[in-house]
């Protein structure tokens, strides 16, 4: 996906992330390994709301580490500052980079499904420039945020199996795939 005015971290060799089997992924649904695959697997309702949530989490990270920069760029105000997902994004530059790539992937997927750009993309350039303000570090285990569904939790560092179980159990009753994507195989019980 080519985003006007957006910098995809995949386009910058020194900032590329390894999305192989060793690196997986208010919530961040780690239902696939790669951010593009996650975005394609989200239901229509989530591809509408999740880009804003991810933008808010990324902006919260920048407010935490560089309030002067966040203020200068007029980023979204900090939200849910003690929630595990924003805390994970602000912990290391690698975490932030993964969350940023997921944000860009969701913006592209929204455009694919709805034929227009999501309003949450307005901060993408400032967020991409702000990555250097996040502390360096490798990816860390992602928290499992399943309110009321602790039975879905696993001992995975990158809880794809857990998030798929949660997404299927908690979201399949309302999840629609009418905008150019099919329901993922794993949600149909075939994988």
Role assignments for model-derived ranges:
Residues 1-13:
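Extreme N-terminal basic, low-complexity initiation segments
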């Amino acid at each position: 996906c080519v985003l006007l005015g957006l910098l995809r971290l995949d386009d910058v060799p020194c900032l590329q992330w390894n999305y192989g089997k060793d690196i997986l992924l208010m919530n961040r649904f780690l239902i696939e390994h790669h951010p593009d695959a996650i975005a394609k697997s989200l239901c229509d309702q989530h591809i509408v709301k999740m880009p804003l949530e991810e933008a808010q989490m990324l902006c919260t990270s920048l407010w935490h580490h560089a309030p002067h920069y966040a203020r200068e760029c007029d980023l979204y105000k900090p939200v849910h500052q003690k929630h595990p997902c924003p805390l994970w994004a602000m912990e290391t530059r690698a975490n932030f980079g993964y969350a940023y790539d997921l944000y860009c992937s969701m913006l592209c997927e929204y455009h694919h499904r709805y034929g227009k750009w999501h309003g949450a993309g307005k901060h993408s350039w400032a967020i991409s420039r702000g990555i250097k303000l996040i502390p360096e570090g490798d990816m860390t285990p992602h928290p499992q945020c399943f309110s009321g569904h602790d039975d879905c939790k696993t001992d995975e560092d990158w809880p794809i199996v857990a998030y798929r179980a949660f997404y299927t159990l908690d979201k399949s009753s309302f999840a629609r795939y009418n905008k150019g994507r099919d329901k993922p195989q794993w949600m149909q019980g075939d994988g």
